[in-house]
C-alpha cells in the first residue's frame, strides 16, 4: 500500500515493465513516471482522433429505443479517444460508449489560453498526486494544460522549476507568469491574481498574488 504520486489519464500510452498478479507495473510514455495499473484498465492500442476539453465528460449508452442514457462513468479533461462513429450530438469511442460532441475537440487542437483551461478546475479539491476532476495538485494543474496541447513538461514542481529555468519570484507579474515556492507552483492570470491548487485551502482557487506570497 502506498500513496498516489500521479495519475495516468485515459488514452495515455505507457510501457509495461512487468506483470504482478492482476496488476501491471508500467512506465508512462509522456513523463516517465512509474506506477501500477489493473489489467482491466488497459485497452487495446489506438490512434487518438479527439480529446476531452471539459473538466469531466459523462459517458452515455444508447438504449434499444436509440435514446442516450447517462452512465455513472466519465472521462477527465485531456483524455484521448478514437472516434468510431458520430451523429449530431454524440460521438462513439468504444462499444456503446458515447460522449457529447461539445465535450471534445480534434486531437491536434491547441488551446493557447492557459487561464481558461486552469479555470475549468476551480474549486476542484486539492489531492496530492491528482490530475483530474476528483482531485489535483499544483504541479498536476500545470502539467495537464501542456499535456492537453501535446507538449512535454515534467510532473513534479522541483523539475518544472528547472525545466522552465525559473530563478526567483518576480515583482512584476504579467498574465501567465509562473510563480514558485519550494514545493509549490502557481500561475498568474493577470497582474493581480493567480490560480493554484492550494493545500491549505484544500482546492483550486484564485487568490491575490501579493497576499499569497506573504502567506506562503
Predicted features and spans:
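Active-site nucleophilic cysteine motif
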Residues: 118, 130-149, 153
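Short solvent-exposed strand/turn elements
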Residues: 28-32, 208-214
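Short, intrinsically disordered, charge-balanced linker/junction segments flanking boundaries
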Residues: 1-5, 213-216
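Short, basic/aromatic beta-hairpin or loop at an interaction surface
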Residues: 1, 49-63, 144-161
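Boundary regions of SH3-family modules and the immediately adjacent low-complexity/disordered segments
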Residues: 6, 10-21, 27-59, 64-71, ...
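Hydrophobic beta-strand signal
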Residues: 15, 76-82, 180, 187, ...
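Short alpha-helix capping/helix-loop boundary micro-motifs
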Residues: 1-3, 61-71, 161-170
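...with weaker cross-activation on analogous glycine-rich loops/strands in unrelated enzymes
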Residues: 151-210
Amino acid at each position: 500500500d502506498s500513496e498516489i504520486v500521479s495519475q495516468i489519464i485515459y488514452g495515455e500510452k505507457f510501457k509495461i515493465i512487468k506483470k504482478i498478479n492482476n496488476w501491471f507495473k508500467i512506465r508512462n510514455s509522456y513523463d516517465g513516471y512509474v506506477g501500477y495499473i489493473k489489467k482491466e484498465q488497459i485497452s487495446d492500442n489506438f490512434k487518438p482522433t479527439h480529446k476531452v476539453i471539459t473538466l469531466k465528460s459523462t459517458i452515455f449508452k444508447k438504449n434499444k429505443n436509440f435514446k442516450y442514457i447517462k452512465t455513472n462513468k466519465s472521462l477527465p479533461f485531456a483524455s484521448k479517444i478514437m472516434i468510431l462513429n458520430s451523429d449530431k450530438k454524440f460521438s462513439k469511442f468504444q462499444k456503446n460508449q458515447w460522449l457529447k460532441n461539445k465535450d471534445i475537440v480534434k486531437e491536434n487542437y491547441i488551446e493557447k489560453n492557459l487561464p481558461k483551461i486552469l479555470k475549468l478546475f476551480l474549486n476542484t479539491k486539492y489531492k496530492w498526486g491528482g490530475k483530474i476532476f476528483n482531485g489535483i495538485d499544483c504541479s498536476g494543474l500545470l502539467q495537464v494544460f501542456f499535456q492537453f496541447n501535446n507538449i512535454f513538461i515534467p510532473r513534479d514542481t522541483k523539475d518544472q522549476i528547472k525545466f522552465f529555468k525559473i530563478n526567483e519570484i518576480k515583482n512584476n507579474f504579467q498574465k501567465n507568469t509562473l510563480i514558485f515556492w519550494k514545493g509549490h507552483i502557481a500561475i498568474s492570470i493577470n497582474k493581480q491574481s493567480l490560480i493554484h491548487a492550494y493545500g491549505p485551502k484544500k482546492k483550486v482557487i484564485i487568490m491575490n498574488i501579493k497576499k499569497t506570497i506573504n502567506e506562503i
